[in-house]
């Protein structure tokens, strides 16, 4: 999976963004479960998924704040 930039994230629609947020939260849950059962091979996915989730949540919060202040 290629690294997304903030510019790519800002181009997503609200529905796409919420879908990606939901998918990343599920992926993080699965990664934690695999790590606990010692089946996880790609530990770098934790950092990548958390970073991507943080970017999505930041842009989502920016949008919601700009909608309420306008």
Swiss-Prot record:
Q: Which keywords belong to this entry?
A: Ribonucleoprotein, Ribosomal protein
Q: What is the lineage of its organism?
A: Bacteria, Bacillati, Cyanobacteriota, Cyanophyceae, Synechococcales
Q: Which GO terms describe its molecular function?
A: structural constituent of ribosome
State if Ribosomal protein is listed as a keyword. yes
Please give the organism: Prochlorococcus marinus (strain NATL1A)
An individual GO BP term: translation
Q: What is this protein called?
A: Large ribosomal subunit protein uL29
Name of the gene this protein is made from: rpmC
Q: Which Pfam families match?
A: Ribosomal_L29
UniProt-listed InterPro entries: Ribosomal_protein_uL29, Ribosomal_uL29, Ribosomal_uL29_sf
CDD domains hit by this protein: Ribosomal_L29_HIP
**Family assignment?**
Belongs to the universal ribosomal protein uL29 family.
Tell me the domain of life: Bacteria
A GO CC term attached to the entry: cytosolic large ribosomal subunit
Any keyword Hydrolase? no
